[in-house]
Every structure is written in structure tokens, then in C-alpha cells.
UniProtKB/Swiss-Prot annotation:
Its main location: cytoplasm. It comes from Bacillus subtilis (strain 168). One of its GO terms (cellular component) is cytoplasm. Its EC number is 3.2.1.10. GO terms for molecular function: alpha-amylase activity; oligo-1,6-glucosidase activity. Pfam families: Alpha-amylase, Malt_amylase_C. This is Probable oligo-1,6-glucosidase 3. The record marks D326 as: Transition state stabilizer.
Amino acid sequence: MKKAWWKEAVVYQIYPRSFKDSNGDGIGDIQGIRTKLSYIKELGADVIWICPLYDSPNADNGYDIRDYQNILSEFGTMEDFDELLGDIHDLDMKLIMDLVVNHTSDEHPWFIESRSSIHSEKRDWYIWKDGKNGKTPNNWESIFGGPAWEYDQKTSQYYLHLFDKKQPDLNWENEKVRNAVYDMINWWLDKGIDGFRVDAITHIKKKEGFPDMPNPKGLDYVPSFPYHMNADGIMDLLTELKENTFSRYPIMTVGEANGVAAKEAADWAGEKNGIFSMIFQFEHLGLWDVEINESIDIVAFKRILTDWQDSLEGIGWNALFMENHDQPRSVSVWGDDGVYLKESAKALSAVYFLMKGTPFIYQGQELGMTNVAFPSIEDYDDVALKRLYETKTAKGTSHEDVMKIVWKKGRDNSRTPMQWNAGPYAGFSEAKPWIGINENYKWLNAEAQKNDKTSVYHFYKSLIKLRQTYDVFINGTYELILPEDQQIFAYLRKNESHTALIAANLTGTPALFRHSGLPLSSDALVLSNIETEPHKHMTSVLLKPYEARIYLWC
């Protein structure tokens, strides 16, 4: 396979509203990011991905864009952005931005003109339909709950919004829409950014005719993913997108590819004809949709991640992640954010970080930041969470039971302010932040962990150093071992010069690792999260709860 700078990179994701406030208004901003670039550089990351900075009314925290070529005033100005981009490049790092083109804000000039009249020149820039029998055009449910259609009194038609009603879907069947989007993308790339993470891109193609979903349960609105997620014909749109934008620049692109199966991976992220440099697949995150007190199926976890490794071996590239701004904190879901917080955060990091692909670290993940449990739904900001709460309680679910779901799976778990130190407001701001801070910030923070060589932060630094030092962790092959073990996730990475073993117990009870073909010795142990006893030529070792070991042989 060809070499590419993004294959060797480690990406650090920033959610700007919660990263660092520079002007005391309780909201993170661009100048705040500039003050923390040295922190990211010292960690060892080489690429920064920043969630939307564009002008937005913030119905969905920036994913409802009002102006693609302007900066939200809360975050700063375009001049601030240009300074940030220059700083990042001066540090020999790169910057990728979120690209949100399935939908815009309903306050975008395109939509304002579109809704002004049935005869507007931009009417078909969005998806407008007449109602059916006094109801919505079809029975599709929005991803955020409720109908996927909103009635507009001025023109007596409905517009489609797969997400919030303030996020109308663009009509990608319209060539003028596509060309306007391409012009905007190229404007940013000409400015000098280094790529995009492409949001919700699997939803741009809708099933022809917009038919009703089958509805055997007689629901008011039916989850409609089969008719708008990775739908037939989407590759034609994506191929044109790539040809008119991405392929013209030496950039990194990451597609948010919800609904894409491992067997389709080459079409999306294949080196020969794939659309993107890599994609985020979400199959393993489906394992989080379990009962609140149910443990994760480790065998299924291994199988899913291995399927993706195998599907792209020799033909494409994986994006490796456990957290982002839309997911809960991994240590609170996959690990143990109580007694074994430090150990489990490190074990999880070792497992995902050293697979074949480009690893992503979400802000605070390198500290083992945890989920938060605010008592009231009013303490939360996320529009999807609030819709969930309204829907569940309206159907009779108790406040307590709904909050258990919020505490485990809510998106705001990862959106609380970055915990920089033990000072007021966790060093994030000098004023009360836009959302509450996790109360554990007084002991779980960046300053404390930088001063503790046994911290999660320093373990991440060590993982990054390993990856930078040994090519086997970048280009080596991947081989799962012990696939049916219900506690241990173990795999090999191999190239012509090295073999590496990554083995981690992902449970709170001891687990016996046994493999006769891998004699384990202390002199080959390059990293572990728990101090080990001297050992030589062992064919089995007892791994303590959440113990992880990385061995390397020449």
C-alpha cells in the first residue's frame, strides 16, 4: 500500500465549546484552543480535528450551519481562525474541520429563500412535499425522534429534516446544490486546511419516491434508516463529490459512515477507488445499546473490530476510535470508572490504539474523563437528549429510569468542559461554563496527570511514542488471537522486522492468558498498565483486572 501522512498520524479531536474559554464568557473559543496547542503537541498528536466553528444558531451545537464561510461569533472571527491555522502549521501539525452537508440550518440564506415561495429559484434546493391525507408526506421518524417532516404554513408544504426541525435536509439530487457545496468545500481547502471529517454523509441519498416505512406495530412515525442511510445510488453522489473536491488536494478525509458494513469498506475507504481516506464505522458502538446494567459482550466486540481490520487489510485504511462528541465516555461504558478507572482506561486505550489504522483521541479521553450524572434534564443541553426525555416520559417512563439512560448513553457525557486543573471551573473558564462540570475534576485533571508518571495521560503518550518508533504498529498486519475468550482481547501485529502482542483483560476479574506459541519474557515487555513480576519464557500469565501488556519481538 502507498504511504500517506495521515496513516502515520494521531488525531486529537476538539469540541470547541468545551475545550478552553479565553474571554470569560463560559464558552470555549478559538483563542482558547490556541493557548492549548502546546499541550496537544506535547501529548504527541499531529492532527487536530475541530468540531464545527461555523456561524450557527446552535440548535444542535453547531451542526446546524447558518453560514459555511463565517465563524460563530462566540468562537471568534475568521481572523482568529486564520491565526489558529497558522499556529497549527507552525507546530508542524495539521488541521481538519467538520463538514456538514446533509443539511443546513433553517436560518441559512439558501433555506430562507427556499421557503419564501413555492416558485422560489431555490425551492428545490431542499426537499418539499405536500401532505398526505392531512398528515405528513410519509411516516418517517426523525433520527432525533418525532416526525421527519415539518409543516410550513406560508407555502402549505412540508420540508424534510432527518435530524432536528431546524436542520432541513439539502436536496442532493439538485446539481446546483451539489455545485454550491463543492465551491464551499474548495474555498476552505484553498484556505489551507488539511482535510475534513464529513458528518452524516451516508444520509444524503434518500429512497426514490419517499415511500412509507413498513409499520406492523402501527407507530405514529417509524425509524426510517433503511430508506435514507447508505441508500442505493449514494456512490454516484459521493464519487462526484470526491472528483470535484477531495481528489484535487493532498488532504485527509474521514467519512462518518453510519450504516456501512465491513463488506462495503473498500468502496468507502479503499485505496484504489474509495471515497474517503478512512471512515468512522459505528458497528461496535451498537454494543452500547444494551440494558443499563448489562455488561458488554467482549467476544462480539473483538469480532466486529476484527471484521473491519480484515476487510481493509491491504486495500484500505481504518479510523480507530472509542470516543467522540456524540458518544459517552468509553471508560464509563466499556471499563470501570470507579475502582479500576485508571487501569481500565489504559487497557481500553491499548486495545484500540495499536490496531491498524489512524487513532483518534477525543479531548479528555487521554485523562480517562468519565460520564457525568446531573440530576435534572434541565442540566443538559443536547437537543436529542431533551427529545428522548420528552418522548419517554410522555409514554409513562419514570424520571429516574429515563435519567439512567441519559447518564449512560447521553451525548452531553462527552461535552462537559475539559478538566485542565483543580482550580475554579476546572481551569476551563473564569466564569460559569455553558454546561456543568464533572465534579471529579478536582482530582481528575490534566495538570495532576502530567505530574503523575503512572497516569492515563502518560500511558497515552507512551502509546503514541510506540507507534512513532515502530512501523509494525502502523503498517504491520493484524491477527486476532483467542477470539472466543470472554475476558481477554489479544491480537498480533507483524511486519518483516517485528512481531507485537497486545493483550488486555477487559473485565474486573483476573483472566488467564495462555498461548503456547508466544513465550513471554520481561525483556520483550515494552509497555504495561500494571507493574509486572520478572518473567521469562512464560506460555501463560494471569492478567489482573483490566491489565494490559504489550510485548515486542525482533
